[in-house]
Regions:
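Primarily recognizes the serine-hydrolase "nucleophile elbow" in alpha/beta-hydrolase
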Residues: 1-10
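Flexible "cap/lid" loop of the alpha/beta hydrolase fold
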Residues: 9-42, 84
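Hydrophobic/aromatic beta-strand patches that form the interior of the parallel beta-sheet core
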Residues: 11-15, 108-110, 141
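Conserved alpha/beta-hydrolase catalytic His-Asp/Glu region
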Residues: 44-92
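The feature captures the conserved acid-bearing segment of alpha/beta-hydrolase catalytic domains
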Residues: 95-102
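Short beta-strand/loop motif that positions the catalytic acidic residue
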Residues: 102-103, 108-111, 115
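Conserved alpha/beta-hydrolase "acid-adjacent" motif
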Residues: 116-122
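Catalytic histidine-centered segment of alpha/beta-hydrolase-like enzymes
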Residues: 117, 142-158
Length: 165
């Protein structure tokens, strides 16, 4: 996203977001090992099945739309391993305050109840941080029956209803 867009923005919608992916709890070592296994599979050219499983878990508890699944599987043929590895390595980094945030942003923070990708602690820590740091507390929306990737619901309707309460 272009920085000028963020500089001009007054509202931001964060969906299943984090500042630091790795939690501080005992789950940290498990997640580190999982990331390392993913890294090794990418390096060894064994990433197709891993990515299929990742996408499947991203949508759980919902099913993946067949047209999306077909597009995704087809895109695995042209996978940029270098870019994928670089993105994966970003998950190891602990960050301070996100540079794109201004303290006067109005933030809508959406969290999926059944996210199997992002550890609850990482998500909750980011929300706690925003609550302490921003001028006004984020608007919190908890989505039942949704995974990391949102599926079969109307985001516009949810945002409209929440903002007009």
């Amino acid at each position: 996203m272009q920085k000028t867009i963020l500089k001009e923005a007054t509202h931001i919608v964060l969906i299943n977001s984090f500042n630091n992916f790795l939690p501080e709890s005992k789950e940290r070592n498990f997640i580190l090992r999982s990331l390392k296994r993913m890294e090794i599979k990418i390096i060894k050219g064994q990433s197709k099945n891993m990515l299929k499983e990742f996408i499947h878990r991203s949508f759980m508890p919902n099913d993946i739309n067949n047209s999306f699944k077909n597009i995704f599987y087809k895109s695995l043929e042209n996978l940029n391993k270098t870019l994928l590895l670089n993105d994966l390595k970003q998950l190891y980094i602990n960050r301070d305050f996100p540079v794109f945030l201004k303290k006067d942003f109005k933030i809508i923070f959406i969290k999926s109840e059944n996210d199997l990708i992002l550890d609850n602690e990482s998500n909750d820590n980011f929300l706690d941080f925003l609550n302490r740091t921003l001028d006004s507390k984020p608007i919190f929306i908890n989505l039942a029956h949704q995974g990391h990737c949102l599926n079969n619901f109307n985001l516009y309707e949810i945002l409209f209803n929440k903002l007009n309460d």
